[in-house]
Amino acid sequence: MSTNMREMLEAGVHFGHQTRFWDPKMAPYIFGHRNRIHIINLEKSLPMFQEAMKFAKQLTANRGTILMVGTKRTARETVAAEAQRAGIPYVDQRWLGGMLTNFKTVKTSIKRLKEMKAQQEAGLDSISKKEQLTFKREIEKLEKDIGGIQDMTALPDAIFVIDVGFHKIAILEAKKLGIPLIGVVDTNHSPLGIDYVIPGNDDSSKAVALYARGIADAVIEGRASAMDDVVKAVSAEGSDEFVEVENAAA
């Protein structure tokens, strides 16, 4: 879960957007500018990223679920891979309006997808070729739209968003429901309303990979921590029982 300044530099986390596009609310996190490009202060970004990872780890250790969101072309593949590695839900293609605020309807679509997948595994020989084609097109669309959240049985306990400006609808829905937000915020967007701000480049594929990997690692560590606690609790109970039996025999 550790990330250092050198890794951030190599990933280009410090490169912001052109100065003319900046959001003044990001001023506290900007070091300066070079060739009309804002330079993000990594001495601010690093501890804030570490704080976000710490939150992700603690949330997961307490059985919480984090939804990872990154639908830009530079983020899709990485988001899907890292979320799958960490075993958490994700959105990598497009954010459907109401994905959170109308989750009841989304759950109906998830149920439909699972039923269709089961039907596909059982075989489609009983329906015509034309019906098979229609069936496959529907299942492909559902996989694309909600495939990453098909195992999400309830609203997430937090959302990690790469590029808050690109995912405004997701941000608004999370705020409306009071779901904590971890967000990568570049110099051209406002950090207001984001609970755990990560000031940084939101376009570089290397930077995106660093953020996604860090949060995924935090989730994995949090889950391992929770498992350790369970093992310790079970071991302690077993130890107590053993002592009682031994004393009784004496």
From Swiss-Prot:
GO biological process, one term: translation
CDD domains per the UniProt record, alphabetical: RPS2
GO terms assigned for molecular function: structural constituent of ribosome
Protein family according to the UniProt entry: Belongs to the universal ribosomal protein uS2 family.
Record-linked InterPro entries: Ribosomal_uS2 (IPR001865), Ribosomal_uS2_bac/mit/plastid (IPR005706), Ribosomal_uS2_CS (IPR018130), Ribosomal_uS2_flav_dom_sf (IPR023591)
Keywords, in A-Z order: Ribonucleoprotein, Ribosomal protein
Protein name: Small ribosomal subunit protein uS2
One Pfam family named in its UniProt record: Ribosomal_S2
One CC-aspect GO term: cytosolic small ribosomal subunit
Species for this entry: Polaromonas naphthalenivorans (strain CJ2)
